[in-house]
Amino acid sequence: MTACLRRTRTLLALTFALAGAWAAAAAAAPLSLRDDSGQTLTLAAPVQRVVSLAPHLAELVFAAGAGDRLVGVMRYSDHPPEALLLPLVGDAFAINLEVVATLKPELLLVWRSGINPRQQQRLATLGLPIYANEISSVDGIADTLRRFGRLFGTEAVADAAALRTELRWRELRARYGRRSPVRVFYQLWHEPLMTANRSHLIHQAIIACGGINVFGGQPGLTPTVSWEAAVAADPQLVVTSGSDNEPARLEAWQRFSQVSAVAAGHLVALPGHRLARMSPAFVDGALALCEAIDRSRH
């Protein structure tokens, strides 16, 4: 064996040894990640047991390839169907801390806007790490997926889901965004009448579809508006969503035949609540909205 060949083999062996050492060190190193509240979370290893305290967070965990790590969810965590089989730990009004504790989670996922200070204080008494999430755009959905991939050690699945979400959103905007504008009223609730302003993800979907959110300029994320104001805005399309548990309620609009949407029969109930969920399913909901807006153009 020549000296040159021996040196080459020695270098290769050293390279592989160093690569293995680096990989082992990376696996053993603590995981440090900043959440959407600005707090840095440090964990010894990828999370194996997690409780989600918002339905969209459960969806994101599944989409990131870590559905098997979920040990507890909130009421209305219904997508994917496997989420319905998990223990319930509460709803939007109350969290059962005793149930949470018995599930022995390593991490709690909370929706920053969906939890009040009193609930935060009570959760802190459990002494568990808390990851606070806040999403205000489709980019935020993709970013959360990637961060969840790091939290759970499922980067390959999570990164692919994030990229797929970004590409689908880009394609939707390119396809529908430049079509003739349609005035849209999105009804979040019927009594009192509630809608979404420009800070809401639903507004972003309306704009991406080539629509105009007639109350986009209102203060508050989900402003309450009067029927007089809604009629005066004269939307060309009225949209809401519904499910078996919460049927769509659009019948009150029939009183106002002078509204363009009513006169044309453009009152649409989208199935499910995909547009209200800050998860990859939001893009599915946005596509259904775009199709409804497109039909109202004819």
Pin down the residues of each PLM region.
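Proline-aspartate-enriched helix->loop->beta-strand connector
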Residues: 94-113, 128, 226-243
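Bacterial N-terminal signal peptides
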Residues: 11-23
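Extracytoplasmic substrate-binding proteins
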Residues: 31-33, 39-40, 106-107, 111, ...
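N-terminal secretory signal peptides that target proteins for export/translocation
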Residues: 1-6
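A short, structured surface patch at a secondary-structure boundary
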Residues: 48-103, 107-113, 214
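Short helix-initiation/N-cap motifs at beta->coil->alpha
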Residues: 34-38, 89-98, 114, 218-227
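Boundary at the C-terminal end of the N-terminal hydrophobic targeting segment
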Residues: 23-30
